[in-house]
Amino acid sequence: MTILRDYKLSGRKAFAVLLDPDKVEQDAFSTLLQRTADYPVDFFLVGGSLVTDYAHKEVIATIRRYSSTPVILFPGNPLHIESSADAILLLSLISGRNADFLIGQHVIAAPLLKKSGLEILPTGYMVVDSGTQTTVSYISGTMPLPHDKPDVAACTALAGEMLGLQLMYLDAGSGARRPVSAAMIAAVRKAVNVPIIVGGGITSGEKAYEALKAGADMIVVGNGVEQDPDLLPQLATVVREFNQSVVQA
């Protein structure tokens, strides 16, 4: 989606909400979508590392009823392809060494993606240690990047960019005890020119601002925005004010 690159080139930042179909509670979900009229988000991501309900189509249909915001799939496996979305993050788990998540799943998904009409976003997916084991680390059988090793993350991202990946996604994971560090985001920002997405552990406006200032082009928050009524306006306001400061500068 060229809009992410446009955001980066302009210096503007994006805000995305990640919706896990397994964790969507319908009443809270509808309320969240209505609130985005006052506190806009730039993208909805739909998916998760382990989705058992496969309600992607229903979740996307509900989003469409309330919003024209673009929907991007965040797939855990080839079964999570849904053509009613706008685009899909084609995730290559470059922080790990499991060939199935580097290329194996992609071989299975490729013909389905070809037919889907979705915009394909080749993404270097880097799982970062957040103080607790995440679902993606367990399912993939891989170790996350050490929280305090920004140089390792930078070299990993650089290799991904050299391989042709068009986005980098630093993810501390659902339920993270701590977010990706500003030092790691800054190191990756210095190493690569592609847009950087950062998610996991962003539980306050202050943490969102730190990620944006360090070099994140898009921040992602999960279903926690449904549970904490104050989080959506906090994050939307931080991103809006950050972008306003860029324009004024």
From Swiss-Prot:
Q: Which InterPro entries match?
A: GGGP/HepGP_synthase_I, GGGP/HepGP_synthase_sf, GGGP_HepGP_synthase, GGGP_synth
Highest rank taxon of the organism: Bacteria
Q: Which residues bind Mg(2+)?
A: D20, S49
Q: What keywords appear on the UniProt entry?
A: Lipid biosynthesis, Lipid metabolism, Magnesium, Metal-binding, Phospholipid biosynthesis, Phospholipid metabolism, Transferase
Reaction it catalyzes: sn-glycerol 1-phosphate + (2E,6E,10E)-geranylgeranyl diphosphate = sn-3-O-(geranylgeranyl)glycerol 1-phosphate + diphosphate
Q: Record-annotated residues binding sn-glycerol 1-phosphate?
A: Y169, L170, D171, A172, G173, S174, G175, G200, G201, G222, N223
- Gene Ontology terms: biological process: glycerophospholipid biosynthetic process
Q: Which positions form S-S bridges?
A: none
Which PANTHER family does UniProt cross-reference here?
HEPTAPRENYLGLYCERYL PHOSPHATE SYNTHASE, PTHR40029
Briefly state the protein's biological role. Answer: Prenyltransferase that catalyzes the transfer of the geranylgeranyl moiety of geranylgeranyl diphosphate (GGPP) to the C3 hydroxyl of sn-glycerol-1-phosphate (G1P).
* NCBIfam families associated with the record: GGGP (TIGR01769), GGGP-family (TIGR01768), PRK04169.1-2 (NF003198)
The name of this protein is Geranylgeranylglyceryl phosphate synthase
